[in-house]
């Protein structure tokens, strides 16, 4: 039985025994919600998400492209793959580099 995580995101149809899953475990989500593309899923239960955004350069009054990479926990019930567009939510620190968890994954068109 999946629990409501407080976001407007439906629970995945699969069940998992992961304690770090926000739907089937005890991990609570709060804070930032980010959207990005999975660029690596080689680590165990971890994905690397790349976000692209525009940053204003005040001197020239123009925007420049920037990107950042974020590590996130990938629960077995979601299992995002490289190229998927994912929504990640902030949670308590899971490891040295992981403070986010994947809550939704979509295959791009």
From Swiss-Prot:
- The superkingdom of the source organism is Archaea
Statement: the UniProt record of this protein carries the keyword Plastid: no
> One GO biological process from the UniProt record?
translation
Give GO MF terms, alphabetically: rRNA binding; structural constituent of ribosome
Summarizing the function annotation, the protein's role is:
One of the primary rRNA binding proteins, it binds specifically to the 5'-end of 16S ribosomal RNA.
**Similarity field:** Belongs to the universal ribosomal protein uS17 family.
Oligomeric and partner information: Part of the 30S ribosomal subunit.
Under HAMAP family, the record lists: Ribosomal_uS17_A (MF_01345_A)
Q: What is this protein called?
A: Small ribosomal subunit protein uS17
Taxonomy-wise, where does this protein's organism fall, top ranks first? Archaea, Methanobacteriati, Methanobacteriota, Stenosarchaea group, Methanomicrobia
């Amino acid at each position: 039985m999946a629990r409501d995580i407080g976001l407007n995101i439906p629970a995945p149809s699969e069940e998992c025994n992961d304690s770090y899953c926000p739907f089937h475990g005890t991990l609570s989500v709060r804070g930032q919600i980010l959207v990005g593309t999975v660029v690596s899923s080689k680590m165990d239960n971890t994905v690397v998400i790349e976000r692209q955004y525009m940053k204003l350069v005040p001197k020239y009054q123009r925007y420049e492209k920037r990107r950042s990479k974020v590590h996130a926990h990938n629960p077995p019930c979601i299992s995002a793959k490289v190229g998927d567009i994912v929504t990640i939510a902030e949670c308590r620190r899971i490891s040295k580099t992981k403070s986010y968890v994947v809550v939704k994954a979509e295959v791009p068109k």
